């Protein structure tokens, strides 16, 4: 097995086509095909399924690619250290639910290391995507929450994917509403107070059950529901429709502006927000710095 073979399979997976990977790598298509075939035979793994539209990664190929990315990242770090720091391009990826403190911490990491070149990724995603990203090593760590409602299901998924959860802090539920919302002057609100207002939540795709929901009180029935995919849309709807969402209460006025406020929600529940990582994996300096930065924002 050679590093070049691993680079080929990762690029083909990204492109979904050997032809496109060949064009981007400036390597002939037959050379890439032969190299991947040799790698599959040597490792005894079937990485790609061939279709008339290109290639797709097989189930066992996803696992292989996760390890391949980790090997390539480590090789890049090694080369950068001993072949000249100027050639090193740091890589760091985080997958998270829609938390402003996660964005602020990401900014802090970039400012702390302030490299001339870097390749960092922050993905705000659906819950199951966060777990898959960390399991397949697309992200070094993920951020999500556990509660009495979802803990059993999420922890089972983590065990299945050889991931571990480390709690960072526990939060009582709050609601985000616009600053001129009719309930904005309340010291706290109840679910009954909110009945007449649209409930805003993050869509979870085919995993759209309360086990994967980002909103702690998703098990309650609402008359008005709106699901979105991104934070900006959710806040725009909150301001335009007097909608609300349930959250941890940690808010960043630097990111969200003064138009959104947080009010305690009067329910007897809590959420434990933490990070997920691969079992027995040592975090990079960027991962460690990111966790330290999060602790400064909560």
Regions found by a protein language model. Name each.
Residues 40-57:
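A short LG(V/I)-centered, amphipathic sequence patch enriched
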Residues 89-153:
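Central regulatory/effector-binding core of bacterial HTH transcription factors
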